[in-house]
């Protein structure tokens, strides 16, 4: 199944979905050395974003979050791709400077349509995702 969206950052990646209904603060919410979500009370607390297609409504918190996403990439623990309901500048810039394929504004709500563990391919260049 293909779902059309809006391109944020080009590229193509496939991975298992990691889905959250909670917004993510990368600064203080995700350990840049390990990729583990460390924000207490977060739906993904204790889970690791490495190699996943990370699906969440959008970002929250400090503008430094862009650089935390970049650190995740430099440390080899970044998500393979990201999907937001509606991206905001912090996460979008983080994806762009890190070269992480990213889309938002899909025709269907990704948080409701996609389940943890589903195999998802993000074609950031075309603004399309594929579920298999």
UniProtKB/Swiss-Prot annotation:
SUPFAM superfamilies: LeuD/IlvD-like. It catalyses: (R)-5-phosphomevalonate = (2E)-3-methyl-5-phosphooxypent-2-enoate + H2O. GO terms for biological process: isopentenyl diphosphate biosynthetic process, mevalonate pathway. Keywords: Isoprene biosynthesis, Lyase. It is an enzyme of class 4 (lyase). The keyword Lyase applies. Its EC number is 4.2.1.182. It comes from the Archaea. Pathway: Isoprenoid biosynthesis; isopentenyl diphosphate biosynthesis via mevalonate pathway. The active site is at residue 62. GO terms for molecular function: hydro-lyase activity. Component of a hydro-lyase that catalyzes the dehydration of mevalonate 5-phosphate (MVA5P) to form trans-anhydromevalonate 5-phosphate (tAHMP). Involved in the archaeal mevalonate (MVA) pathway, which provides fundamental precursors for isoprenoid biosynthesis, such as isopentenyl diphosphate (IPP) and dimethylallyl diphosphate (DMAPP). Belongs to the AcnX type II small subunit family. Heterodimer composed of a large subunit (PMDh-L) and a small subunit (PMDh-S). NCBIfam families: PRK03955.1. This is Phosphomevalonate dehydratase small subunit.
